[in-house]
């Protein structure tokens, strides 16, 4: 099972585990989670390149990802919007496939 956790106050998302909903290469739940994680990582990188965050990081390994950043000043709302938008996708997957993915929000 994949566990996605959104730490709202820390602008951080972790993704752990594997869905095992189909054979490797044919697992649509895994593909959906991976697409969202990579989208979030790219957006955090763009925020860093644009000077909107002080610090950004993304570690994307099979079955284990962590993505986060520290917003600069007035950019906290923008960063929150981006994180929330991607996390809606994780939440939708968890509702559709509760046997393969769980989603939690902290903070």
What are these model-derived regions, one by one?
Residues 1-28, 38, 42-107:
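N-terminal intrinsically disordered, cationic/polar leader segments
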Residues 29-33:
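Short, conserved glycine- and acidic-residue-centered signature motifs
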């Amino acid at each position: 099972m994949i566990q996605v956790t959104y730490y709202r106050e820390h602008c951080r998302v972790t993704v752990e585990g594997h869905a095992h909903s189909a054979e490797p290469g044919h697992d649509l739940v895994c593909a959906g989670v991976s697409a969202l994680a990579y989208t979030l990582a790219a957006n955090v990188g763009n925020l860093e390149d644009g000077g909107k965050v002080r610090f950004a990081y993304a570690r994307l390994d099979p079955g284990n990802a962590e993505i986060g950043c520290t917003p600069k000043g007035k950019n906290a709302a923008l960063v929150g919007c981006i994180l929330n938008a991607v996390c809606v996708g994780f939440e939708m997957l968890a509702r559709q496939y509760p046997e393969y993915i769980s989603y939690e929000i902290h903070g």
